[in-house]
Amino acid sequence: SKTYSITGWRLGYTIAPEEITERIKKVHDFLTVGAAAPLQEAVIPGLRFGRDYYDELLKTYTYKRDLFVQGLDAIGLEHTTPQGAYYVLMDISRYGYKSDLEFCEMLARDVGVGAVPGSSFFREDVNYLIRFHFAKKDGTLHEALNRLEKLKKL
């Protein structure tokens, strides 16, 4: 889903001997529902992309990551700097909210920036992180950073 900027889509494949493939199919049937036929068709062109596509994708995501994390740094917000993900986790513990969901609701309502509660991604009781997705247009990232400046006043 990250490689082709289709976040949320889940599709995978295996290449294996027939006897292993039969076992994989049995396990797969118990764990998932099938990927939608349009999704399966949509991924075919992506499997044919050459190395240049992936090199350019790396440059693009690295640029967007750096743009966003440098903006967060300039505002003084604590965050992770991902090495391979298309999102940044920001530490909200200094704001005193009881939950990351509560903070995300305030952020959307009062600041005009959407984020996902980090607790959605942890088995442990982690409620002091929120997740920003940076695979966006540059203008969207700049606008989000401008709006996040409001957090300085909290």
Predicted regions and their residues:
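PLP-dependent class I/II
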Residues: 1-154
